[in-house]
């Protein structure tokens, strides 16, 4: 019997998915042995019992069984351990006064505990360490759990708010597009009508343009207000009633390393460089997508990119 057949067969009752397509497998976090739902109901319905796997002496309870999420039981076990440990060791960077070094040491300690529990290293000592920390920090753990729940609620509210605003924005943009199309059609007809009584074409066109400009729709004004609301999204700056500090990221000039408008022009389509010309003939370069015009373009970009870049002005606009 190959591994795929074993995967779809209950090791206790030997029923497989070929005969029972609706069969579900369950696992228990005590030992992570896979058992079909029928066997779980049959063996554990009267109360706790020993795991039916040969050589396993773990006592299992019916209410502890759950559906396996990951194909790899090792991954399933690690995820459960992480969930359990992080419910106890739930400090955040703010609890360390934003001291990254102290927070990193704390995370390293947590990872050591997870590793020991996952690999069965010093189990008694590690479990005792976990229990001791939980008893000594009950209030902090509960406060962080409540804060975490509040952060999740705020995130969901923010998602809902942004979704509603973006939907309104799309509707307004569609309305503006339709109004602009109607204004263009009206302008064409109006120019033709006015030219029948006024021979000065430039004056007619200018008057029609002014009229169209004055027809600035209420939808456009609403769109501008909506964009302001999105930029000043209250859910982006507040977390659980506290002002969220803006992430400190390195400032990158040149529009984020992207020069959208090239600061140079090539007078000639081709530049003759003997070294580059020889590379274009080599198969290993051609196979990798080598192109001489990309090389020249990159060299010129690097040479001209910093020209006209005033850091102080870019900092103000960023």
From Swiss-Prot:
One of its GO terms (biological process) is regulation of transcription by RNA polymerase II. GO terms for molecular function: cyclin-dependent protein serine/threonine kinase activator activity; zinc ion binding. One of its GO terms (cellular component) is transcription factor TFIIH holo complex. The gene is TFB3. This is RNA polymerase II transcription factor B subunit 3. A zinc finger (RING-type) spans 10-55. It comes from Kluyveromyces lactis (strain ATCC 8585 / CBS 2359 / DSM 70799 / NBRC 1267 / NRRL Y-1140 / WM37). It is found in: Nucleus. The keyword Nucleus applies. InterPro entries: Cdk-activating_kinase_MAT1_cen, MAT1/Tfb3, Znf_RING, Znf_RING/FYVE/PHD, Znf_RING_CS. Acts as a component of the general transcription and DNA repair factor IIH (TFIIH or factor B), which is essential for both basal and activated transcription, and is involved in nucleotide excision repair (NER) of damaged DNA. TFIIH as CTD kinase activity and DNA-dependent ATPase activity, and is essential for polymerase II transcription. Disulfide bonds: none annotated. CDD domains: RING-HC_TFB3-like. The keyword Nucleus applies. Keywords: Metal-binding, Nucleus, Transcription, Transcription regulation, Zinc, Zinc-finger. Pfam families: MAT1 (PF06391), zf-C3HC4_5 (PF17121).
């Amino acid at each position: 019997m190959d591994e795929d057949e074993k995967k779809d067969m209950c090791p206790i009752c030997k029923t497989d998915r070929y005969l029972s397509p609706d069969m579900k497998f369950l696992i228990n976090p005590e030992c992570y042995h896979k058992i079909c739902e029928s066997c779980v109901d049959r063996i554990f319905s009267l109360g706790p019992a020993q795991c039916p796997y040969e050589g396993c002496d773990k006592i299992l309870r019916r209410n502890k069984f759950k559906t396996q999420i990951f194909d790899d039981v090792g991954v399933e076990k690690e995820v459960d351990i992480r969930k359990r440990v992080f419910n106890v060791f739930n400090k955040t960077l703010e609890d360390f006064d934003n001291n990254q070094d102290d927070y990193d040491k704390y995370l390293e300690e947590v990872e050591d505990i997870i590793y020991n529990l996952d690999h069965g290293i010093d189990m008694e000592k590690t479990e005792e360490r976990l229990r001791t920390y939980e008893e000594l920090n009950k209030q902090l753990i509960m406060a962080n759990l409540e804060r975490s729940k509040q952060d999740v609620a705020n995130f969901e509210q923010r998602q809902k708010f942004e979704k509603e605003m973006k939907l309104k924005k799309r509707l307004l943009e569609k309305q503006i597009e339709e109004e602009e199309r109607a204004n263009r059609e009206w302008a064409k007809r109006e120019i033709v009508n006015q030219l029948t009584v006024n021979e000065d074409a430039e004056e007619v066109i200018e008057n029609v343009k002014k009229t169209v400009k004055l027809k600035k729709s209420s939808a456009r004004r609403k769109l501008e207000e909506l964009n302001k609301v999105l930029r000043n999204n209250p859910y982006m700056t507040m977390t659980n009633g506290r002002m969220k500090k803006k992430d400190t990221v390195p400032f990158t000039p040149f529009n984020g390393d992207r020069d959208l408008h090239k600061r140079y022009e090539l007078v000639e389509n081709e530049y003759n460089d003997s070294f580059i010309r020889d590379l274009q003939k080599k198969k290993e370069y051609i196979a990798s997508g080598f192109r001489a015009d990309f090389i020249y373009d990159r060299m010129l970009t690097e040479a001209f990119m910093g020209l006209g870049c005033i850091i102080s002005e870019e900092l103000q606009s960023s």
